[in-house]
Each structure stands twice: as structure tokens, then as C-alpha cells.
């Protein structure tokens, strides 16, 4: 059954038109008003912190409150602080050099709000992945329509009521619904469309945006590999791999998806990962800090991927725990040497399952990574900086971390985004501000300017100026 009726489409269009009109009335939202908007986002995040944790717990069944605090609430508070601190300098016009034959004059770039922007967000970090692009769009002076995920209804309702406390609907509006609503949402002629979600839906969104020539940012997924070099102490790998993989039960776009270790080291890495995760969650089944899988559909998909690898002869290592009952929890799992053609090695896993395979040297590892779609993140484990750099040079990914996982996400001055099938465009910090603004080129000349000398009738002065 469709989750959309004609009334909803009309309402969505009406909100869009109201935002358009409001934007026309305030094309250059003043600095002080943008600061108010940023402060409102920060204040809402802090004020509703407990409600955000409750909503995430209700949507996932079990969602670690500490992980919600870390990855949704604290992240947003610090992103808002960063934006507030730097907005003034981001908004300044940027002067550029004027070539000698065009002098005198002033050339500069004005960063201007694009207008009404659409944001579509996923379920895995349902608060942060909606609020973070909203923050960037508001800092840029835009109006925002958000379509959050249908898989996290409690969080979507909460965000709608939170935002209504501080923003009129003609400034920030939330449209609730599933794929059909999403499809109608993407048909509106936004000034920018910002999509976070799967590569499959990213293609659909991109086509819809193209109909209106709407510029689009695609924050997608993919299989983010870990490449380990010979000089890395394999017994230490689990310390960081376990955190990267089992945070939010692996439902993280930049979670390490699979690991390629040197020959003879996969078992050590697997055992150190299981040992670390066992220490983190002595009984993962009852531990409130070990998150559940978001829906029955996702739960069944992950279990069937593990079973497929088991039937194909791969060795499965799992952390010990009691029976999770109906909690939709999957034991932290490591799979040794699954076949390359198994779903675990073909699809983005997006759950608490980590395949570990061996490579035949770094050239082989890079070749195998490069044979797949370009990943969102790539992790290099190498003691030697030279080795790490050679892996960076031999591969392409949206972002990368050396000797750790995921931490690049929290460095606000780094652009966050994918490349190829893992996305295009970026945000965070100034990159988010740039995404939602248009770089308008301005060249100011005096009333009489020597450029008149290159106008017809062409003659000696023209020849002199244009001589190559
Ligand atoms: P999804 O693509 O299923 O859904 C994302 C959003 O798109 C939801 O709001 C959904 O309702 C909407 N949608 C679904 N069909 C649509 C359509 N036809 N037209 C318009 N909108 C539609 O993704 P998901 O399952 O929520 O998220 C998981 C994926 O997102 C993973 O691949 C993950 O790697 C990726 N992801 C990427 C990032 C990133 O920052 N790059 C962050 C989180 C998740």
C-alpha cells in the first residue's frame, strides 16, 4: 500500500511554495539571525537530549544511550559550536587577484544562500544525520524541508515537534513518510537536494533531481575496507576494529566493512577483535550498550548472510552471550575467509559482522579493493608512515584514517563525503556551508575601465592588448 495520498502531495507543495516565498522575502539572512538559528539547534539538542535517547531506544528496541549521547547529541552540540565560531569568517567575501590587463577593479566571491533545500535522512543515526545537514543549511541562510526515515518513527516525530518549537514551517519543515513520500519529495524543484542513504536509492534521487536541474549531494554507503600491513601488530588490531565495527551494532556508514590482513595473521586479528568486544560487552545479549538491529527485515538479512558464509565453509567466531530473546540482537561476529562471491563480500554489510581475509602483499590488497566500487572510507593499519602513504596513493576513497577507524568523521574541518558509488559532494564545517551556498563571482570596475579599448572598431590598441 502506498504511504502517500494526493492531500499529502498538495501539502508538501504548499510548504515548498511558502518556503520559496519566505526566501524571496529574505534572500540574505543576516549573520545575527543565522547565529540565532544555530543557537536554536544547539539548545534543542541539549534540551531534548533524554527524549532523543528515548526515541532512539524505542526505534531500535535497544540503542545504547551512551552511543546516542556520543554520536548524535555530543556530536551535534560540538558541530553547532564549531559553526557558530567560524560562521563570520565563512560569510566574508573572498577577494581574488585581478589580472593586469583587467585592472583597475575588485574581484571577489560572495557566498550566497541557495534558497529552499530538501534533506532526506536515513535511520542509522536518525538525529545527527538529519540535524547536521540542517545546521549547515541554516548557517548558509537557506530554508529547509526534511524527510526523515520511516524506520525510526519515534525519532522522526520527535524531530518534527522539536523543530516546530523554534522554527516556522516556512523556515524548517518536516515531512513524514516512507519511499513513496520520499519520491514525491524529490520531485519538488529545490535549490539543492541533500540525500543520505543507500547507493541504490541515491541513483533514484539523482535522476529525480536531474529533472529540475537541482544540484544534489549524495552521502551514500559502500564497503569500507581495512588494509593491514606486515609491520602492524596484529594482536592490537582488535582494540580499534571492535569499536569501529560494533558501535551501533555495525549500522554505521563508515564502519570497517571487511579486513585484509597479511598472510598468517587473520586469526590473530579475529581473536583480538572478539577478545576486545567480549570485554566491552561481557554479555552482549543483555548489555544495554550493545545495540539491536533496527528492523526484522534487516535482522533476517544479516542472519542469512552469516548462514550463507557458514554453508560455504567460512569459519564463524562469535562473542559469547546469553539468549537475546526477541531483542533483534546479533552476536558480535567475525567471519574468517568468506568466499569473494558471498553476499558478505559483495554487499555493504551494515551490521555486526566483520569478514577477515588474507592478502598476498599490499599490492594484492589494493588491487582487490580497487576492483570494487570506490568506498566511503578506507582504513590503513601500518606502523610505517611511508607504507601508509603508499596505500593512500594506491587507492581511492571518500575519506581515510591511518591506524584507527571512523575518527575522521569528527574532525569538523575535514570534508565528509564519498566518491564514485559512495557519493558526491561533502559537508561538515565549512564544506557544509559551501554545499548550501552559491559561490557568486563579482567583478567591480570603475565607470571608465580600460576594457573599452578592446571593443570594436578593432585597431592598434586592440592588437597590442591581445597580442600573444
Ligand atoms: P535508504 O536509502 O533505504 O533510505 C534513506 C532515505 O531515503 C529514507 O528517508 C527513505 O525513506 C528515503 N527513500 C527511500 N526510497 C526513496 C525514493 N525512491 N525516493 C526518495 N527517497 C527515498 O537508506 P537507509 O537504509 O536508511 O540507510 C542505509 C544506507 O545509508 C547505507 O548504505 C549507509 O551506508 C548509508 N549511509 C550513508 C551515510 C553517509 O554519510 N554517507 C550515513 C548513513 C548511512
Functional labels for PLM-detected ranges:
Residues 23, 27, 42-45, 49, ...:
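Structural signal for hydrophobic packing residues in well-ordered secondary-structure cores
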Residues 167, 200-339, 402, 460, ...:
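ALDH superfamily catalytic-core signature
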Residues 34, 80, 141, 172, ...:
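Residue-level signal for inorganic ion chemistry
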Residues 2-3, 30, 227, 322-323, ...:
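Conserved C-terminal structural/oligomerization subdomain of aldehyde/semialdehyde dehydrogenase
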Amino acid at each position: 500500500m502506498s504511504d502517500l495520498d494526493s492531500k499529502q502531495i498538495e501539502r508538501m507543495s504548499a510548504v515548498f511554495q511558502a518556503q520559496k516565498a519566505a526566501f524571496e522575502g529574505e534572500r540574505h539572512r543576516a549573520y545575527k539571525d543565522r547565529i540565532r538559528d544555530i543557537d536554536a539547534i544547539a539548545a534543542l539538542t541539549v534540551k531534548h537530549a533524554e527524549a532523543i535517547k528515548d526515541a532512539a531506544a524505542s526505534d531500535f528496541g535497544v540503542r545504547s544511550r551512551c552511543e546516542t549521547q556520543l554520536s548524535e547529541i555530543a556530536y551535534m552540540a560540538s558541530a553547532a559550536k564549531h559553526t557558530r565560531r567560524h560562521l563570520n569568517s565563512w560569510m566574508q567575501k573572498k577577494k581574488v587577484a585581478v589580472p593586469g590587463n583587467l585592472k583597475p577593479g575588485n574581484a571577489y566571491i560572495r557566498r550566497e544562500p541557495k534558497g529552499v533545500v530538501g534533506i532526506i535522512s536515513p535511520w542509522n543515526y536518525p538525529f545527527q544525520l538529519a540535524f547536521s545537514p540542517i545546521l549547515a543549511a541554516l548557517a548558509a541562510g537557506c530554508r529547509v524541508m526534511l524527510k526523515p526515515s520511516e524506520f525510526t518513527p519515534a525519532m522522526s516525530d520527535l524531530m518534527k515537534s522539536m523543530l516546530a518549537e523554534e522554527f516556522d514551517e516556512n523556515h524548517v519543515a518536516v515531512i513524514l513518510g516512507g519511499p513513496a513520500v520520499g519520491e514525491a519529495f524529490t520531485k519538488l524543484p529545490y535549490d539543492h537536494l541533500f540525500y543520505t542513504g543507500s547507493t541504490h536509492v541515491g541513483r533514484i534521487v539523482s535522476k529525480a533531481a536531474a529533472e529540475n536541474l537541482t544540484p544534489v549531494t549524495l552521502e551514500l554507503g559502500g564497503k569500507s575496507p581495512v588494509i593491514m600491513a606486515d609491520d602492524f601488530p596484529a594482536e592490537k588490531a582488535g582494540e580499534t576494529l571492535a569499536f569501529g565495527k560494533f558501535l551501533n551494532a555495525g549500522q554505521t556508514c563508515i564502519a570497517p566493512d571487511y579486513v585484509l590482513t597479511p598472510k598468517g595473521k587473520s586469526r590473530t586479528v579475529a581473536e583480538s577483535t572478539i577478545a576486545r568486544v567480549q570485554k566491552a560487552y561481557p554479555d552482549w545479549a543483555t548489555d544495554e550498550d550493545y545495540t539491536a538491529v533496527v528492523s526484522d527485515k534487516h535482522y533476517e538479512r544479516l542472519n542469512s548472510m552469516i548462514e550463507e558464509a557458514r554453508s560455504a565453509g567460512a569459519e564463524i567466531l562469535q562473542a559469547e552471550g546469553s539468549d537475546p530473546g526477541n531483542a533483534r540482537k546479533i552476536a558480535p561476529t567475525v567471519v574468517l575467509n568468506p568466499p569473494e562471491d558471498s553476499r558478505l563480500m559483495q554487499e555493504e554489510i551494515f551490521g555486526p559482522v566483520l569478514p577477515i581475509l588474507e592478502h598476498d602483499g599490499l599490492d594484492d590488497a589494493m588491487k582487490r579493493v580497487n576492483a570494487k566500487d570506490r568506498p566511503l572510507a578506507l582504513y590503513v593499519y601500518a606502523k610505517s608512515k611511508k607504507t601508509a602513504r603508499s596505500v593512500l596513493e594506491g587507492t581511492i576513497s571518500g575519506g581515510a584514517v591511518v591506524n584507527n577507524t571512523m575518527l575522521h568523521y569528527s574532525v569538523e574541518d575535514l570534508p565528509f563525503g564519498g566518491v564514485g558509488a559512495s557519493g558526491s559532494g561533502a559537508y561538515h564545517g565549512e564544506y557544509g556551508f559551501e554545499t548550501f551556498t552559491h559561490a557568486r563571482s563579482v567583478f567591480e570596475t570603475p565607470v571608465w575601465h580600460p576594457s573599452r579599448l578592446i571593443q570594436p572598431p578593432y585597431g592598434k590598441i586592440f592588437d597590442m592588448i591581445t597580442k600573444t
